[in-house]
Curated annotation (Swiss-Prot):
Keyword Hydrolase found: no
Alphabetically ordered keywords of this record: Ribonucleoprotein, Ribosomal protein
Record protein name field: Large ribosomal subunit protein eL21
GO process annotations (BP): translation
Family according to the record: Belongs to the eukaryotic ribosomal protein eL21 family.
GO cellular component, one term: ribosome
Membrane spanning residue stretches: none
Annotated GO MF terms: structural constituent of ribosome
Length: 96
């Protein structure tokens, strides 16, 4: 087969959900609100492609710096480099 370079390549196991967590996503995850400066975890929701950050940021933790439309802007350190990631709330979980 030909070599493909899609945004979800090499995510066969990374984006796999637990059997009991499959199905419709709760509405509360869609309407989450975060405070600026709050720490959040990036956990990509594989059943919703819209607003999903790049697979390299899956499992990382960042700080909320603002909102852009329905999405949230986060700062994340990728090595020593600070990067801005834009993701919808379905793919974010507040740090406890």
């Amino acid at each position: 087969m030909a070599h493909h370079n899609g945004p979800r390549k090499k995510t066969r196991y990374k984006f796999k959900k637990d059997l009991r967590k499959r199905g419709i996503v709760p509405v509360t995850s869609l309407i989450q609100h975060f405070e600026i400066g709050q720490s959040v975890h990036i956990v990509c929701e594989p059943s919703i492609q819209k607003g999903m950050p790049h697979r390299r940021f899956h499992g990382k933790t960042g700080k909320v710096i603002g909102q852009r439309g329905r999405a949230w802007m986060l700062t994340i350190f990728d090595g020593n480099m600070e990067k801005i990631v834009i993701a919808r709330p379905q793919h974010l979980k507040a740090q406890k």
